[in-house]
């Protein structure tokens, strides 16, 4: 999951926003020891409303490139996924320095981030995939800074490697 905290001026309380890739935001007020004081918003109604569309779960994966680099990704498969059938794949990635697309957090809006349009495409039989290549954030300074003064080279290679890896899957 993903947490984002906003603290009170005296640090006695904080507003915590929690989500994961398959659950919308839950806002709670907590004390400094992490005890829930009050739930502000749980988004149960949104969860129920979205259930009618039968969204499939975002799945996370890791693979290793031919250069020995471990890359993280996520994919959303069609609802009636058959692992013996081949599916068209749509890959989306920004890969700008320090960016991160592969997070275990809620994303309902934009295309390519696991938003509603991506789920619509899965209903039409597509697999949607995002892979964080070298230069993206969340993996430490060495991983993020390896593209310094060489933007576009390693990031592109990593996306090609991801496509090759996906092409080798049974589906």
Feature locations, PLM:
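Serine-hydrolase catalytic core recognition
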Residues: 2-171
């Amino acid at each position: 999951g993903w947490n984002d905290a906003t603290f009170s001026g005296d640090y006695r309380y904080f507003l915590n926003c929690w989500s994961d890739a398959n659950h919308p935001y839950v806002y709670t007020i907590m004390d400094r020891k992490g005890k829930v004081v009050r739930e502000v918003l749980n988004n149960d109604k949104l969860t129920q409303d979205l259930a009618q569309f039968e969204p499939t779960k975002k799945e996370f994966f890791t693979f290793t490139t031919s250069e020995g680099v471990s890359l993280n990704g996520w994919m959303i498969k069609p609802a009636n996924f058959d692992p013996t059938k081949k599916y068209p794949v749509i890959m989306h990635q920004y890969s700008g320095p320090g960016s991160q697309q592969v997070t275990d957090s809620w994303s309902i809006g934009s295309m390519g981030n696991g938003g509603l349009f991506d789920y619509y495409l899965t209903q039409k039989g597509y697999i949607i995939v995002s892979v964080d290549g070298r230069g993206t954030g969340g993996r430490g300074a060495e991983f993020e800074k390896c593209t310094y003064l060489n933007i576009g080279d390693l990031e592109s290679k990593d996306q090609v490697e991801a496509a090759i890896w996906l092409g080798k899957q049974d589906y």
